[in-house]
Amino acid sequence: MPTLLAPLNKLSSDVRRAALLNIPVTARTISVVLTRTRDIDMTVRRLVYGSVLLTHAELPDDAMPGAAHPRALTIAQREQIVRHGLGDREPAVRAAAGKLIGAWVDAVSVGTKKGAVFEDLLAFLGTFDLRESAVVEDALLSVFVTRVDVFDALEFDGAHLSS
């Protein structure tokens, strides 16, 4: 495995991009992939969020979650993705991270019934440490910006407000 991951540490950003696109994202490789969220090259950082993690975050029907599915990541890894992605200096990287975080809402979706958006957002928030984390607010705001459909579908009634 070390030989397979070695190109991710090469000086050439082209080599790192090619390695990211061809490396299998597994529980053993995800931590190395996440180190590229702090790459010096903006294109590599954008690729991590917009291609590698996004592709492996979606859950095919009746399949086990991939290594980049929000439930497969640790809380620390999810928080790292949010912090580094939404805090990046480049707007293109922030946009790619926002798209990934928006996709997480669908990835952890609990149902398809009418009005399930609130429950889906609760499931999304449940993937974070709500007591200790400061990035949850950023993640939720990002969902509201990138997923206008989610924001527009939110309805608060007395049952939600009384609990």
How would you describe each model-predicted region?
Residues T29-I30, R78:
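N-terminal alpha-helical segment
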Residues D62-S163:
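Long internal repeat-built scaffold domains in very large eukaryotic proteins
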